[in-house]
Structures are given as structure tokens and as C-alpha cells.
């Protein structure tokens, strides 16, 4: 839940106006909006590069994934793996834009471990792929922007533990 929604819900539950502290937090959130949008735009503009290089790093670190019998063996399964990585990158951009993990959690992480287990896909391999994408994505950003994006990648990774 965004800081705006959370503040309004809390104030309304107490039948009061927003406090000066809540208004300050909302102001900070709004002022950080341009930065969050810029970060999301950079990641979106570079999504093919991030997914491709992240996938290449995954396959170097985990060659078993693309070896015969691996979950990403063959062209079709490799494409499926890269599609999944792209999905997690998209979720990260949603979180960045919202300034909150709720979209990541509600759209894409509920039942993620169970889903991959039911498919016979080790979640650890998916997590390595997301970690590799984090490395590529954060290399495109500087300082606070990199830390901001890193937070949402880390949140996604935490749900895969």
C-alpha cells in the first residue's frame, strides 16, 4: 500500500484529517515521483538488454539449467526462462513506480514457490536469474537510483527464499 493510501486509510479509520507528519511523508513521496519514473523508464528502455544479459549470466553460473534435462534446455525452454525473467523485471518496475512492494507482492509473488515446485523448476535457478538481472540493471543506474532499484529486486528475491 502506498504511503498516500496508507496515510488516508489510517486517518479515515480515526475520523481525522491527515497530520502534518503524514502530509510531509506524502510530499516527499510525490517529490520522489520523477526520480522513480526515471528509474522505471531506464529499466523499461533497457529491458531486452537486462533480460538477455541476466539470462546469459544465469546460464554461465548455472550451466545445468541449459544442459540436457535442465529446465531451460532447448530453444523453447530457454525462451520460457527468459520470458519469466522479463516478468520479474516488469514487476520490479511496477514497485519502483508505486514506491511500494504491494504491486510486486499482489501481482506476482503470491504462490511463486509453489508454482515453480509444481512445475519441477528449482526456484533457486529463478532467483539466480533475478539476481543476475539486478546486477545488469543496477549497472545502468547510479547511486541512489541503483539502490532504489536494488531494493525492489531484493524484495523479489526474498520472496523466492
Curated annotation (Swiss-Prot):
(2R,3E)-phycocyanobilin binds at residue 81. Disulfide bonds: none annotated. Its main location: plastid. One of its GO terms (cellular component) is chloroplast thylakoid membrane. Contains one covalently linked phycocyanobilin chromophore. Light-harvesting photosynthetic bile pigment-protein from the phycobiliprotein complex. Allophycocyanin has a maximum absorption at approximately 650 nanometers. This is Allophycocyanin alpha chain. It comes from Pyropia haitanensis.
Amino acid at each position: 500500500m502506498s504511503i498516500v493510501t496508507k496515510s488516508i486509510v489510517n486517518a479515515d479509520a480515526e475520523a481525522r484529517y491527515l497530520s502534518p507528519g503524514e502530509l510531509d511523508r506524502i510530499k516527499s513521496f510525490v517529490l520522489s515521483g520523477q526520480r522513480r519514473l526515471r528509474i522505471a523508464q531506464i529499466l523499461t528502455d533497457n529491458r531486452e538488454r537486462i533480460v538477455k544479459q541476466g539470462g546469459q549470466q544465469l546460464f554461465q553460473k548455472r550451466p545445468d539449467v541449459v544442459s540436457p534435462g535442465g529446465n531451460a534446455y532447448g530453444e523453447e525452454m530457454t525462451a520460457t526462462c527468459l520470458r519469466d525473467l522479463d516478468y520479474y523485471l516488469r514487476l520490479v518496475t511496477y514497485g519502483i513506480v508505486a514506491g511500494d512492494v504491494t504491486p510486486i507482492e499482489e501481482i506476482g509473488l503470491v504462490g511463486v514457490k509453489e508454482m515453480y515446485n509444481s512445475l519441477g523448476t528449482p526456484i533457486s535457478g529463478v532467483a539466480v536469474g533475478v539476481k543476475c538481472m539486478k546486477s545488469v540493471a543496477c549497472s545502468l543506474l547510479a547511486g541512489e537510483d541503483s539502490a532504489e532499484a536494488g531494493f525492489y529486486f531484493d524484495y523479489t528475491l526474498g520472496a523466492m527464499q
